[in-house]
């Protein structure tokens, strides 16, 4: 399980970079809310994360159903974190760090035991 988590984390580093860049563009160039910026960053990064983790971490096939489960769960998580950040007036960097930490742990557990549970 540790080996899988290390692989998942490695892909997560790239995923986080993608997410943060898109988030920054939304906040500072497009002047969106944190909820929208976080969700947009997520949408761009989640596809990379799903396909990379399916192939390299879990060695599983990609199906539309698996994709919908993954995107749905992570999308809800993204919106909740962004909404809470807006309500608490958190600085954008705190939102990014918070979502990155929560999504790493929750995303791994959800991927391993729900999305890719049948993967060999």
UniProtKB/Swiss-Prot annotation:
Keywords: Membrane, Transmembrane, Transmembrane helix, Transport. The chain crosses the membrane at residues 10-30, 34-54, 65-85, 90-110. It is found in: Membrane. The keyword Transport applies. Disulfide bonds: none annotated. It comes from the Viruses. Belongs to the GtrA family. Involved in O antigen modification. Involved in the translocation of bactoprenol-linked glucose across the cytoplasmic membrane. This is Bactoprenol-linked glucose translocase.
